[in-house]
Amino acid sequence: MTDNKNQVKDEVLAYEMLESRGPKGAPKGDPVLSVRDLRVSFATEAGRVDAVRGVNFDLWGGRTLGIVGESGSGKSVTALSLIGLLDDNAHVEGSVKLKGEELLGKTDEEMSKLRGSRISMVFQDPLSALTPMFSIGDQLAEALLIHNPKMSKEDVHKRCVELLTLVGITDPEDRLDAYPHEFSGGMRQRVVIAIAIANNPEIIIADEPTTALDVTIQAQILDVLKVAQKETGAAVVIITHDLGVVAGIADDIMVMYAGAAVERASVDSLFANPAQPYTMGLLGAVPQPHVAAEHRLVPIKGNPPSLAAIPSGCPFSPRCPMAQEKCHRIEPKLEPFAAEEGHLVSCHRLAEIRDKHMTYQDVYPELEPLPAKWADVPRDQRPIVLEVKDLVKTFPIQSKGLIRRNKGTMTAVDHVSFKIHEGETMALVGESGSGKSTTLTQIMELMKPEGGSITVLGKNIADIGNNRERRELRKNLQVIFQDPMSSLDPRMPIYDVLAEPLKAQHWDDAKINKRIGELMYLVGINPDYVDRFPSQFSGGQRQRIAIARALATNPKILLLDEPIASLDVSIQAGIINLLEDLQAELKISYLFVAHDLAVIRHISDTVAVMHLGKIVEYGETEDVYTYPKDPYTQALLSAIPIPDPQIERTRKRLVYQDGKLVPAESLLPTKL
């Protein structure tokens, strides 16, 4: 224990020597926030959970620190510990100083005075931060008055209008009387940012502030966050899993794994010279939205360790391709990779990585080319497996009040047409409300549509005469959802989950047993695990099992509704590779709905862009991404965050407004 404490002390002293010069580009003077040897553990029934283990960093006013890592790496716990919002069973050690004032050890009452005034938080889900029973104006006023009780009513109202204007809410005077449910998700997040900056805080902590938003709304929220920072001069800590977001907004980056920082650098240094094998793996797993896909993605094998049972030595060693015997025994310390830039890395093989100028291509297995998709048979000469013609779907618009009356109709899908050939992947993209999920639902239901036609494997579903025919067709058209638990019964072992669709097709036990073994092998899950329950698998493994269930009846078409949206980037890469392998082997066709446009470019052959229920652009994926013709498509593609800070700084983002393209910077709110 004494040796461990001495090692921690040495690390803190070494870190302070490096950080005393500040990261590259940091302003002179003392940091606003100084964190030393931060440790957070939780007492649970499963034992002690070490969620944060010896984190150190400094942050200056006007600068942004991005904290990245997989789920369970300790990012959010680190953020919550800074603002004193951890659960009662948390034990916190170390030091967190706000302009020299120690925050750890303060009472709840003392921290309440700081929260919202000197340090603020923006959460992932704005509804968790907004009270549905109170108007937006009331909630803004509360944020002001709780720290400024002597503010006059007129000053409060004026400041509320200023704040809504600053975050880009139109008609702020009228919007003060609105309630959270009357705002869209993006507008609610703007309001949360307005509340966070109401009292000009010195630090803003944003925990996954754009995760649930469309790419265009995400870009707008990040712009608002930048304006808020400029207005207040605050230091910003942003927690995210999206390396493209970090590249565009952060000055410095800290990569966390198993509760500890494994790499810390300026954004330029880390993206140009990632030196920790884990960081390299994260960057290798990310699809590049600005270039054509030439190689398979590089997933990181395995899963992050349980924080209740962190392995000895380097926690990443069980997954690291470079791990040696020493890596499994001794946890490495943070050491300088490029000291003049404050680039710190924890890896026993750092000297070798630095001297040989190693990249992720050297560390991870050689990149394989994408699997061939039957180049001998042109796609347009293969059979059409799914054809949609002039599809229409409307919904009634009802009046408010006790007696609901139809006031008209809203067209969710407006004469949509497309076709998918055997072995082809087609993507439907667009913002929320564009009609893509409704289109998918209409195909899924296998019922006669309100307007137009849907033809599956040459059969017009309007001509299906009975349930037997529909059941026969359904086995060839299966669905994979975003949340695998929606298709996996938590009370059933995996064997029963996979056997259920086969029993519905009246397979005998011998054939079922053989097929389940084949399915587990296909999706890369050990067949010995068939007696386990869904809760005993990781998120990525559960999605593989959901894919296996969808493949059980040998379908010709898979409908994929955001199948990787809830997964870490390293796990996403494995699922994408799996889908590509299955398509090459089985000649299966995919209709892929997703909001991640980088993934779409990597996996799809054709893409249809939807806006307000209509397809506004449709064609070969590379043609659409390289030479977009429709203004809406151009705006959509310009909003994709690219995991390269050099490119992100020089890009010009466009906004589609009133039927035309407008430079995003012209719409940014400015200092009042």
Segments predicted by a language model, with ranges:
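P-loop NTP-binding/switch modules centered on Walker-like glycine-rich loops
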Residues: 70, 84-85, 205-209, 213-295, ...
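Helix-to-loop junction immediately C-terminal to a conserved catalytic motif
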Residues: 83-84, 444
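ABC ATPase NBD coupling module
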Residues: 89, 103-120, 146, 269-274, ...
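Conserved ABC transporter NBD signature motif
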Residues: 91-102, 452-463
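Conserved signature/switch motifs of ABC ATPase nucleotide-binding domains
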Residues: 116, 181, 199, 475, ...
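Conserved ABC ATPase "signature" region
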Residues: 155-174, 283, 460, 510-528, ...
